[in-house]
Amino acid sequence: MEANNYTPSLDKYQIPVVEASQGYHLVLASPGCGKTHILAERIRYARERGVKYEDMLCLTFTNRAAREMTNRIQKVVGGDFSELMVGNVHRFCSKFLFEQGRIPADSAIIDDEEAVSIIADYRNEDEEGVTRDFNRYKGYQTIIFFQHFIYQLEHQHPWKYYLHPESFTDDDREAVKHICASQKIEYDEQAVVNIYHHAQEYMDEVNAPGLDGKTADRIRVLLWKMYYANCYARYKEENHLFDFEDLLLYTYDIYRSDPTCKRYPWIQVDEVQDLNGMQLAIIDLLTAEDNPMVMYLGDEQQAIFSFMGAKVETLTLLKMRCKGNIHHLQRNHRSPKYLLDVFNDYAEKQLKIDRELLPLSDNDTKATSGDLRIIHSSTIEAEHKDITTEALSLYEQNKEERTAVIVSANSDADRISEAMTEVGLTHFKVSGRDLFDTPDVKLLLAHLSVLSNEHNSIAWTRIMKGMHAFPSHALARRFNWKLKQLALSPSDFLLYPESCYTAEFLRAYNEEEIVVFDTETTGLNVFQDDIIEIAAIRIKGGEVVGEPLDLYIETDKPILPMLGDKENPMYAIYHEKMSAGELLSPSEALQRFLAYVGTSPILAHNANYDYNILDNNLQRYCNDTMQAHDIRCFDSLKLIRLLAPSLHSYKLESLLETFQLAGVNSHQAIDDVKATISLVRLCAEKAREKQAQQEAFIHHPKVKPFANVLRSNYGERYREAVNRLYKLSTDHEPALVSELSAAYNAFRSDGLINDIPRLDYILRYLRIDMLTDETVANALAPQLSQYVMDINTLKEADFCNSKSILERIYVTTVHKAKGLEFDNVIIFDAADGRYPNAYNKTRQQDEEDARKFYVAMSRAKRRLFIAYALQKVERYGRVVNRELTPLMEAISKYFN
């Protein structure tokens, strides 16, 4: 590596990692060794040596880590790296399935609560009651996990890639064996699958003569689990719904069977110790066969996610795969030596890490009195107060420092938070139910989601429930399903009180002349780019009327010769027209187009784009607007999505092929208009078939009350927001933040949602930390397009390392603290029985608790306090004496 090309911050251990350009490599690094920085430097190094962004893949465990990686890449690399995929494995799978048309375009992703709601509907149980009851909720999760288990069984996945093998319990096995013996069939995988698909038919087995009660209970539990798991699977399939684990399973199966899927020659994977077997298998399938560059980065000391399927053995496997290319980052750039001595001694003695492989510090700052302390409290209750007092002291003495109280359970966080609140200590709690998982915040995000994509059925379901149109998500889902069968959209009830979108189109198609048009432009920015060709053809009843219009327009903006990896046909045509003197000025061409349209409705494929770039060109060159002409606009993309809702792609080229329509999608406006007319004729045929059913449904006396409530509670808010989608904001507030605030205020004043005291955290984070790309116009539509997917993956922990957070005291669980860093850390209740947990049943669980303790300690950058209570009052009033966790034995000498 040329030294003058690189920042001096790279140390001698990091440089070989950055330079690695082929083969499989494993980087093992403790916290503070600069992993995120070298990930970004590797991208710069590879890019400078000709690796294309679209051939790179950067994967990590959490969305938060992916966002941090993206921010670091922006600082190190700069420029436009939008072709570079940075995200967690689920994000990659979602992007692949949707963008590559591998699943229907109207598919939606459901979260855990929505999955529970679906099953609760089959069980005739109150979905909210289930969510509030931990034990019932856990039972529902078992059903969901079992459905994935059966999917993997049916698709013959290797056992090591099973996501939830524990969902098929020993009792389940005994139940299946009994059924097989009773039915005289062989006990094997196919028998399990067969019983699963016919669970109700085997219910009589429970009542077999002579069957003991224990076996009967086993069979009953298994068969009901199978029945509801099958119901859940069928519901998802029928409604094009995918839960998060489906994203992994479907992607794995597609990549396993289709050699044409894109493989990546350059991959780096962070936090590899947290990935489960299926995620690693997917990464292997994504890897190009011909001499790939794959870099894994991890830390076996921080492997604490076994409850999500991660295994410590993963690093053992990767060490064998990467033999000869294992790198140890041995310079810690974050922790002072006195803290690193604590971490390293602990890693060596408790985690059995070779001392030679542990990092040294480049920070020789000496510890001052009290930087490392053990806090002894008389009781748990006293410990809450003592920790609060300590946190308050740190807060008052060190105005720039941040302090975290790290706990092992959500209930601990609640009690610490209560103690801090009592003394007026402002703090931020990251534990328990996440702010982004609360119904009110989900409702606000659903509002943004339907503005971004009005075909998002899950978001509409949440809105219908939240607007009190339906009492449950289950009823709202059924209503949405019926709308889909009838080519109706929920927005029809808000925009067309006695009609619907397809009916309005059909009326115009039959009774009026429609101008079908298309534009070719210098780019995709509707606010800044120019139209260079505009073409139009009039039709009535599907027949062409009069002469076509095809105008070429001069521009001073560059025209790209290539559109991605394809030639741009407009490049040569435009320059031919320019040489022949056949280009019109923008004002003349636009005025001729408006004259051609007159008062007729217009139609385009993906009309939102064409209409709004036309509107902005009119403003720029004619001091005019589309709104001033009050021209109705239809969109063949919206029409065909309503009328044929299960297609995988709605690009014009794909639709021509799918329906065998006349025309060619050449990206020349006049050709695209002719192709769109073919599609419009098909839409009219399909709309005609639905019209009578639509009218009957819209005017049905049982439907009207629901529609009226939805219209009354949401119609005005929705219409106002839709009208603002492409309006540039004139103030400094991001348009998306303004819309979120306006929706909250409207819903709250109407009594539709409760106060959200912490909404300001979200608004500040969006304003200061997320909506930072200055190339994205300050209008709602482009900001939604750029950010809505990221917004829907936010968690409270994202706030902790952000610029927007004002608090300097945090209360967090160990798992949510992972990846964060604080000046001061106080570990709560570090007593024997909590670390390791007294309820652990295996050595592996004790070892994971030891790693959890390491993760908690290593969040500290300056001070580390270990707290515990000398006594605890148990449930029945018995006082129990307690000892400091035995995990402290190797390092207690450093404290006090």
Q: What residue ranges belong to the model's regions?
A:
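Accessory C-terminal helicase-associated subdomains
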Residues: 222-225, 453-515, 523, 538, ...
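Conserved P-loop NTPase-based nucleic-acid remodeling module centered on helicase motor cores
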Residues: 55-172, 316, 632, 654-657
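Helicase P-loop NTPase motor core
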Residues: 26-39, 323-325, 332-425, 579-581, ...
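C-terminal accessory regions
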Residues: 682, 803-808, 831-896
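Conserved non-catalytic scaffold segment of RNase H-like nuclease domains
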Residues: 512-515, 521-620, 626-627, 649, ...
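Conserved RecA-like helicase ATPase core segment
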Residues: 2, 45, 277-370, 374, ...
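Conserved helicase NTPase motor core
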Residues: 7-19, 23-31, 65, 85, ...
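P-loop NTPase Walker
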Residues: 1-106, 263, 344, 817, ...
